[in-house]
Amino acid sequence: MPKFVIEREIPGAGKLSKDQLHAISQTSCGVVSEMGPKIQWIHSYVTGDMIYCVYIAPDEATVREHAMKGGFPANKVSQVATMIEPTTAE
């Protein structure tokens, strides 16, 4: 299945407390569980005013459905074309 990077504009995201991040994570996992095996949350990166999430899903519509059900912004959804890393240079 395709992998997607979701850009979520959340002012002050980098200052969210451990408890707030826990609650956000629980909400996301609950929606994933409700939607079934067609979507999987891999991980997220939290920065100053953004959260970048990586999901596996059949299509962008499924990713956006997850965001809507969870009450999360999904300002930009990009399908990953490929991944590179240091070993790509070898």
Predicted features along the sequence, with ranges:
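Generic, well-ordered alpha-helical segments
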Residues: Q20, T47, Y55-P58
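A short linear hydrophobic-aromatic micro-motif
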Residues: P37-H43, K76
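Amphipathic, hydrophobic secondary-structure cores in small proteins
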Residues: W41-Y52, V63
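Short, flexible active-site loop motifs that bind/organize anionic cofactors or intermediates
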Residues: P11, C53, A67
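An amphipathic, aromatic/His-enriched active-site/gating alpha helix that lines ligand/cofactor pockets
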Residues: I56-M83
